[in-house]
Amino acid sequence: MGAIIHHMLDRAPAPVAPFSHAVETDGWVFVTGQIPENPDNEDEPLPVGIEAQTRRVIDNLKLVLSEIGLGLEHVVSARAFLIDMREFETMNKIYASYFPPNKRPARTCIGVTGLAKAARVEIDFIARRP
């Protein structure tokens, strides 16, 4: 097994718990779940509505990936956590807009009873470095 690299990034939202923004080993990159915080102002209230929250979450994930030299095209798997499964279709519409139809990562969506900072959605990624 190769070295394990823990990425703590200044430009990404500050962790709300004890974790790294991403952990990398043997070309695999595990990106910690992001909630819809503003990376430039964590005191700002979360966006209202599942559409705005989903956009912010994926933009935060893109930021983490870009800081370590990767992009959405490197994502092989995602997990989405939703407070309200009635928002599944709306979240999917926003999520799908970030990936070409024939290049979408594998994904699981899980209904949960709560997320940090009362977020409505959290998403994490697994990416592969070329």
Predicted regions and their residues:
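N-terminal presequence-like segments and the immediate start of the first folded domain
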Residues: 1-59, 63-76, 82-130
